[in-house]
């Protein structure tokens, strides 16, 4: 359910793992939108 949680979540270790996975899958993370979410887990970078 919460598979596409943003990197701004309380658990930073999970955020780091997700970022690494994002890089491994060759998927760019939306770092310019103030949110570091993997586009693979989020249909579109959620800007909030």
From Swiss-Prot:
Statement: the UniProt record of this protein carries the keyword Nucleus: yes
Entry's Gene Ontology molecular function annotations: DNA binding
Tissue expression as described in the entry: Testis.
Biological processes per GO annotation: chromosome condensation; sperm DNA condensation
Main localization, broad class: nucleus
UniProt-listed Pfam families: Protamine_P1 (PF00260)
Entry GO terms, CC: nucleosome; nucleus
Keyword terms, alphabetized: Chromosome, Developmental protein, Differentiation, DNA condensation, DNA-binding, Nucleosome core, Nucleus, Spermatogenesis
Subcellular localization, as worded in the UniProt entry: Nucleus; Chromosome
InterPro entries, A to Z: Protamine_P1
Functional note: Protamines substitute for histones in the chromatin of sperm during the haploid phase of spermatogenesis. They compact sperm DNA into a highly condensed, stable and inactive complex.
Family that this chain belongs to: Belongs to the protamine P1 family.
Name the UniProt record assigns to this protein: Sperm protamine P1
Native source organism of the sequence: Monophyllus redmani (Greater Antillean long-tongued bat)
């Amino acid at each position: 359910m919460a598979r596409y949680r943003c990197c701004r979540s309380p658990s930073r270790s999970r955020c780091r793992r997700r970022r690494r996975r994002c890089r491994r899958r060759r998927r760019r993370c939306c770092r310019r939108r103030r949110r570091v979410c993997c586009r693979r887990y989020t249909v579109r970078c959620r800007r909030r």
